[in-house]
Amino acid sequence: MLGNLDPNLQLDVLNQMKNPKFVIMDTMNFWIEGYRTKLDEIISKVDLISVNEEEARQLTNSLSLIDSAKKLQAMGPKNVIIKKGEHGAILFSDKKIFQVPAFPLKKIFDPTGAGDSFIGGFAGSLSEKKQLSFQAMKTAAVTGSAIASYTVQQFGTKELENLTFRKLNKRIKEFKSLTNFEI
């Protein structure tokens, strides 16, 4: 997982990896504006890029998220996640699309860090899988959304610090029943 860091540092980290199985990267507007050439080089070398709606549009000059995802895939990564804040995220893989909603909450205390929690939960879930299938990525997206739902309930990482697998799995089951989809 190449976190939202200076693209030069991301490239240094990437170059230190020996035969990585699956590389995920995150970025932000500042790096897109100021380090575009280096950023494009990194994008071409990863398996999945995770961006929010604004970043996807900025990288591709397209208003359509589907078109943005296709353009990002053409840059190198076969998989794209576009985070949509309170509206969840969309996973694009080859010609498949999976939209995962945000977990419905009555109260949101602070959304700061929810996107980072989402991609961290996604990466953690995916790392436990024996295969990197679309089904595994769908499950990882649901896990990421469930983890992000805890992040927004408190300031900072307080809610995550007390999160257990039992609580997380309970939320995933509740999520599944609320949205009525198979994972």
In which residue ranges do the predicted regions lie?
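Short, well-ordered turn and helix-capping elements at secondary-structure junctions
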Residues: 27-29, 104
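Conserved phosphate-binding/catalytic loop of the ribokinase/pfkB sugar-kinase fold
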Residues: 1-11, 34
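Conserved phosphate-binding/catalytic region of the ribokinase-like
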Residues: 65-183
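Conserved phosphate/ATP/ADP-binding segment of small-molecule kinases
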Residues: 20-22, 30-99
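Glycosyltransferases and closely related glycan-assembly transferases
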Residues: 10-23
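Short catalytic-loop micro-motif centered on adjacent basic/acidic residues
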Residues: 1-2, 24-26
